[in-house]
Amino acid sequence: SKIIIIDTYYLLLGSISKTPEQKVIQTWHAAGALKKFGLEDKSINLEHKQLIKNYLSVYHFTDYYLVSSDIMKDVFIKSLDAKPNQILPFGLPRLDQYKDKHEYPNKSKKLALYVPTYRDYTNEIHTIDKQKFEKMCPEYELVTKLHPSITSHDSDPRDIQDLVEMAEIIITDYSSLSIEAALLNKTIIFYSYDEAKYDEMRGLNQYYYEMTKENKAYDLETLYKLVNLNKINHKIKPMWHQYTNFDATQKLVDFINKGA
């Protein structure tokens, strides 16, 4: 294949070779990044030269990176050793689906969607009690969508994109889903009850702290107040979506047809 399109970094790419004619395009699997990864990952020992060489062989397999903001350009440069001339400010094809918003039947209660980040360093599952939440926030119905690997707790079976479109309020923590929801002008509340621990274990970048100066709760009482207030944080969307025009797929196709 002359063109290889990927949406994350695959370790196996470091062990194979490509021809000079082949081009690899990174479309990325998320609307942005709030967690540190790649060369900025807290678990990586930068003094381990062979390990870093192995990682770089994976990262350097990519020729182009699609971004929807200058922030993600900066993230790819720092995290994956991308070069400025490899950045394509086309927006992300995965976000084109939101060009035509779907209409959903009005319900008696507005939907509050809770989407917690998967924590791979603990078996503890922190959920929000639905009955208590709906008592404290009587205008809302709480729906919880957990990571697919978590099967010990109830999780709404509907598609996450459908739920995001249906919801009035998105409650999350360190997930890039907040960036995706901001594109739809949703109210986003960060329920970051274990922020210090998560930062210690996984690493949160500066952009997380910048965009969570508003609408952040460390406890349930504050969360209830923010839900009832229902105030949109208008800073998130311009941070991450300066190149999002819902035409990224067409731009990518045109780029490939011109010879990539």
Each predicted region: which residue ranges?
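Donor nucleotide-activated moiety binding/catalytic core segment of transferases
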Residues: S1, P148-I179, L183-L184, E195
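Conserved catalytic-core segment of nucleotide-activated headgroup transferases in glycan assembly
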Residues: K78-S79, I87-H153, A217, Q250
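Active-site regions of enzymes building and remodeling cell-envelope glycoconjugates
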Residues: T19-I25, E141-L142, I150-Q161, E214
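Catalytic binding pocket for nucleotide-activated donors in carbohydrate/polymer assembly enzymes
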Residues: S176-H241
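A short, gly/pro- and small-residue-rich
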Residues: G14-A33, K130-F133, N185-K197
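C-terminal alpha-helical cap of glycosyltransferases
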Residues: N245-A260
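Active-site and donor-binding regions of nucleotide-sugar-utilizing enzymes
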Residues: S1-K99
